[in-house]
């Protein structure tokens, strides 16, 4: 698990955990209404890098700062910010976990300035997600992302041929930051 602070928003911390071998995605989805205020569960097939994830987190915090939030909480706003469109239900359908998801990203915003107890948070996350937590990093994310699916969702043309995952990540970060401008 990674706990981060975005320098421009020192009062908010963000926790990110990556899970594989998830066995209860359907159960998590059925409890989403009660969990949505606490966590966001994101399909890592559509996240090719930490840079992409942090770009959506930053966009979320900007939306909050300028009172442009379109969802009920920070976690759901971040899922929307990952999306190339402004359609909330479409964002959840595409970027949220599926009943058969075997990997997921667990995201939580912490709005108080207290220290985040990583062990307590890990205990809560592992009580919800029945799977193996692995380090949230680009190497592990690269094992799960689906370039064809990303191209379809973000409507990337066949002419766009990034040389590596960094080129793809840059394009997605640009799309996230420019949406709505």
Swiss-Prot record:
Q: Which N-terminal residues, if any, form the signal peptide?
A: none
Which Gene Ontology molecular-function terms are recorded? tRNA binding
Note the Pfam families from the entry. CGI-121 (PF08617)
Q: Which GO terms describe its cellular component?
A: chromosome, telomeric region; cytosol; EKC/KEOPS complex; nucleoplasm; nucleus
Q: Where in the cell is it found?
A: Nucleus; Chromosome, Telomere
Q: Which UniProt keywords apply?
A: Activator, Chromosome, Nucleus, Telomere, Transcription, Transcription regulation, tRNA processing
One GO BP annotation is: positive regulation of transcription by RNA polymerase II
| Domain of life the protein comes from | Eukaryota
Where's it mainly located?
Answer: nucleus
What transmembrane ranges does the database entry give?
none
Role played: Component of the EKC/KEOPS complex that is required for the formation of a threonylcarbamoyl group on adenosine at position 37 (t(6)A37) in tRNAs that read codons beginning with adenine. The complex is probably involved in the transfer of the threonylcarbamoyl moiety of threonylcarbamoyl-AMP (TC-AMP) to the N6 group of A37. CGI121 acts as an allosteric effector that regulates the t(6)A activity of the complex. The EKC/KEOPS complex also promotes both telomere uncapping and telomere elongation. The complex is required for efficient recruitment of transcriptional coactivators.
**PANTHER family found in the cross-reference section:** CGI-121 FAMILY MEMBER, EKC_KEOPS COMPLEX SUBUNIT TPRKB
Quaternary structure annotation from Swiss-Prot or TrEMBL? Component of the EKC/KEOPS complex composed of at least BUD32, CGI121, GON7, KAE1 and PCC1; the whole complex dimerizes.
What family does this belong to?
Answer: Belongs to the CGI121/TPRKB family.
Q: What is this protein called?
A: EKC/KEOPS complex subunit CGI121
Write down the species. Saccharomyces cerevisiae (strain ATCC 204508 / S288c)
């Amino acid at each position: 698990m990674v706990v981060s602070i975005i320098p421009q928003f020192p009062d908010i911390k963000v926790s990110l955990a990556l899970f594989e071998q998830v066995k209860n995605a359907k159960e998590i989805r059925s409890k989403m209404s009660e969990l949505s205020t606490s966590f966001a569960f994101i399909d890592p097939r559509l996240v090719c890098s930490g840079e992409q994830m942090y770009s959506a987190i930053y966009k979320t915090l900007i939306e909050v700062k300028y009172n442009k939030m379109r969802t009920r909480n920070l976690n759901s706003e971040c899922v929307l910010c990952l999306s190339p469109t402004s359609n909330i239900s479409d964002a959840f359908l595409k970027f949220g976990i599926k009943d058969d998801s075997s990997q997921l990203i667990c995201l939580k915003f912490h709005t108080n300035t207290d220290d985040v107890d990583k062990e307590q948070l890990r205990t809560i996350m592992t009580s919800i997600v029945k799977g193996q937590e692995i380090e949230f990093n680009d190497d592990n994310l690269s094992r799960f992302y689906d370039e064809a699916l990303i191209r379809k969702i973000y409507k990337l043309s066949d002419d766009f041929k990034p040389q590596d995952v960094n080129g793809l990540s840059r394009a997605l970060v640009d799309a996230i930051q420019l949406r709505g401008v």
